[in-house]
């Protein structure tokens, strides 16, 4: 029986797809994409890599692997449980990237929203899977980058799936993000002392 856990455990090196210049990251992305196709099947529209890996600003020591899975319908309980198991197994096989892979499972209908959607989405980040994670001001910023730079791991051209984002909406979101998220962190010394977050400030 073809299961996602069997796929990620038994995949040979010759079947790894070169999505990026980094072989270990390609291993993670290939295992995740192949497992996700089995779990989500027809509910999965596409899986896309965006962020620094997609536009040439990736730092192996501090950058995250940013992904979004676009789905037709919100994940049901069965899909959620199987996706959790998939992420757990991939994390066990690739400890280096266990805490630095981020993936949202976003219904297609949400992409019509300019402001952060009211409904949460399943999200994996920092080695933890959240059944319901709210979007913040990063929503439209990430969607702008997604539209401009996305690399399809599964699915077609992102520009045929979501609409372009007006840059003025991105600028508004950046201002909101500055005051709502970043300004309070300037007095959070524990957060500032974390080298991973220091890199984000420098960006």
Predicted regions and their residues:
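Helical scaffold of the NTase/Pol beta-like nucleotidyltransferase catalytic core
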Residues: 2-48, 79-80
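Conserved NTP/Mg2+-binding pocket subregion across the NTase superfamily
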Residues: 4-21, 80, 85-200
């Amino acid at each position: 029986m073809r299961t996602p856990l069997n796929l990620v455990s038994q995949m040979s090196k010759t079947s790894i797809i070169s999505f990026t210049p980094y072989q270990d990251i390609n291993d993670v992305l290939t295992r995740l994409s192949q497992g996700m196709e089995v779990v989500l099947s027809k509910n999965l529209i596409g899986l896309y890599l965006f962020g620094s890996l997609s536009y040439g600003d990736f730092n192996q020591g501090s950058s995250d692997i940013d992904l979004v899975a676009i789905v037709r319908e919100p994940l049901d309980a069965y899909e959620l449980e199987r996706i959790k198991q998939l992420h757990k197994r991939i994390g066990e096989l690739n400890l280096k990237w266990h805490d630095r892979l981020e993936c949202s499972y976003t219904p297609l209908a949400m992409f019509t929203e300019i402001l952060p959607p009211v409904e949460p989405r399943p999200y994996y980040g920092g080695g933890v899977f959240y059944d319901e994670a709210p979007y913040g001001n990063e929503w439209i910023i990430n969607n702008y980058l997604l539209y401009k730079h996305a690399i399809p791991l599964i699915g077609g051209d992102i520009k045929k799936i979501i609409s372009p984002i007006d840059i003025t909406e991105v600028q508004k979101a950046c201002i909101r993000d500055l005051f709502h998220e970043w300004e309070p962190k300037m007095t959070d010394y524990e957060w500032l002392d974390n080298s991973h977050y220091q890199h984000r400030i420098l960006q």
